[in-house]
Amino acid sequence: MKFTLQHKDPSSQARAGELQTDHGVVKTPIFMPVGTAATVKGIFHRDVRDEARAQIILANTYHLYLRPGMDILERAGGVHRFSTWDGPMLTDSGELQVFSLAGCRKLKEEGCHFQSHIDGSRHLFTPESVIDTERTIGADIMMAFDECPPGDSPRDYAAKSLALTERWLDRCFNRYRQTSPKYGHYQALFPIVQGCTYPDLRARAAENVKQYDADGYAIGGLAVGEPTDVMYEMIEVVNAILPEDRPRYLMGVGTPINILEGIARGVDMFDCVMPTRNGRNGQIFTSEGTINIRNKKWEDDFSPIDPEGTAFVDHVYTKAYLHHLTICQEMLGAQIASLHNIAFYLRLVTEARRHIGAGDFTPWKEQMVAKLGRRL
């Protein structure tokens, strides 16, 4: 895996680059649609690739571990063959789901004991078992196993949690170096920088992960309830320390404005469920602001969903029709909204990349942030 830094914005920390994987090139900055169970909910892979123009998608280790399970995935030849997605893929380590969805029943030095949210069965995730699981899934980029504490954690707990994450990280890399890919393509392992909202803990974590000389680095534990300005401050603290020649991934973030502000602070990769989850509930993102398509004002608006959009749904369907589908809870409404939103996110980062290359990212970003904050 190779990351090439191609352009730097003269008036911010924004960067444009290329990440070479065995499944293709990813041009950064990039947004990664979330395909939790090896599918971006409600959208054909063909449309994710060709209409939304996604270059890389994300899948979730916790969910794939429980269903379909590692035996099925290994017999299928890994997640790429199983799902037929032939582009780059990233798996998170499942730590967020273990600590939230499943409910971590017992957190120990060895790992986390938890119960399946599906059938209540008991399981144990350790740094070693998570690396083994991610090897079996076979994504191009794997994430280290860590603890993601609440954003408002007291300092003593945040420090204790970070120390555990650092010990787990060492075990993750030991296991990673002891094992090999199962399906013939290279797999990178990204460490995750934690530290809650404490600048000194974030700085310590960023310094610590540098020792692993990883292919890339992730920033976790943000957008979990802390004020937005604090999130931006933590990004600045971390990115001032992380190596400049490696990609930086901000996990689980966020709104279109968050993404532009993250790019301005030197982030290269993003993922978030917002475009699909919020789309299913009637929130439509556009370059002129946000639409709640459930509102009555759209019931007789026969204009296209987004005249500037790049996906076919933006021009074929009207706001009135999407309003009707959403109110009636028709599956097609969720599909249209999800595809539009993902395509919008991808168009946004593509435009950001173009402006970074042109040297005028900052004034463009400021204009976009002003528009994106509007409620239409």
Model-derived features: where do they sit?
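Short, ordered coil/turn segments that flank beta-strands lining enzyme active or ligand-binding pockets
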Residues: D22, S287, G357
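Glycine- and acidic
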Residues: G151-R155, A159, G216-L222, M331-A334
